[in-house]
Amino acid sequence: MSGNTFGKLFTVTTFGESHGLALGCIVDGCPPGLPLTEEDLQVDLDRRKPGTSRHTTQRREPDQVRILSGVFEGKTTGTPIGLLIENTDQKSKDYSNIKDQFRPAHADYAYWHKYGVRDYRGGGRSSARETAMRVAAGAIAKKFLQTVYGVRIRGYLSQLGPIKVEKVDWSIVNDNPFFCPDADKIPEMEKYMDALRKEGDSIGAKITVVAEGVPPGLGEPIFDRLDADLAHALMSINAVKGVEIGAGFDVVEQKGTEHRDEMTPEGFLSNNAGGVLGGISSGQDVIAHMALKPTSSLRLPGKSIDVNGDPVEVITTGRHDPCVGIRATPIAEAMMAMVLMDHLLRHRGQNADVKVDTPDIAAIARVKAQD
């Protein structure tokens, strides 16, 4: 398996399986001198961890992270940062009945054909449990971006099944189990998920993530465009089946006069581009959306085959999220942070001395908005 490392200058390599002893990662490329503690990482890990509400998996993992290296006297040293989270609530026997069976729409079948062996306990390496380490690594990137450059990254659940958010109040996002920014929609989501759980079924979701204060100039055309790398990062998250930048697929119905983000000395008049022009950040908010499929691990019987190709009826009895999107917001934030951190370091290495006389109109607009 050769695809376990993300990034070029700010790199994150994760390891571990859902029911293994522990999960871990190595973060390399973080500049020295950044104040960093385990508590800094734990905030986002607690937002992501399982068992925090009746609407998520009841597997209860504390997800306590340990910093093994790369930090001395409370500051990063510039050397690789080693992180570890122990697994404490595995119930591998729950998966014994599917040892030789493939769950429909799960990674089981593809992993078997690629590797000839698979860890059937909770999906092994293909489990979304792996994302705990992404969140821990992303928290480092988020702190650097916020501390050094004033970049703020935050996200929210913008759609759960048929329920679409209609307004965004950032102040309530972390005060409900859905990361929902629309207070009027939370009771509706609660009712919907309670009914879904009784049915034994699952549902998909959509997450929106926004980076504010991103300087213009991040992104490396042609093949490492900022939006291309964002799409790559978000698509690498378990269950993600689609990514949009800015207006996304709505551009199909927009006319050019509507889509173009016109400019004035006071700022941009719209942000259909999602903060990226020509693969390079424009200084506007970077906005991305991702769609997550419903989990395929269900207690409802489904048709499949076993390792011999014979027909079987599959029932999954382990503990699973009825909607994986509910806990995906911190993961999306982490991946966006890692992309922006990597591109900022690349930009700083090659283009730090580039100066132009044209004002940063997005920054001007932000200042005026604060007045």
From Swiss-Prot:
Q: Which GO terms describe its molecular function?
A: chorismate synthase activity; FMN binding
InterPro entries in UniProt: Chorismate_synth (IPR000453), Chorismate_synth_AroC_sf (IPR035904), Chorismate_synthase_CS (IPR020541)
Task: Please tell me whether the keyword NADP is annotated for this protein.
Answer: yes
Q: Cite the cofactor comment.
A: Reduced FMN (FMNH(2)).
Quickly give the catalysed reaction: 5-O-(1-carboxyvinyl)-3-phosphoshikimate = chorismate + phosphate
Instruction: Extract the Pfam families matched here.
Output: Chorismate_synt
**Where does the chain bind FMN?**
R125, S126, S127, N238, A239, G278, K293, P294, T295, S296, S297, R319
* Family classification: Belongs to the chorismate synthase family.
Q: Extract the NCBIfam families matched here.
A: aroC, PRK05382.1
Functional summary from the UniProt entry: This reaction introduces a second double bond into the aromatic ring system.
What's the protein name? Chorismate synthase
Organism expressing this protein natively: Hahella chejuensis (strain KCTC 2396)
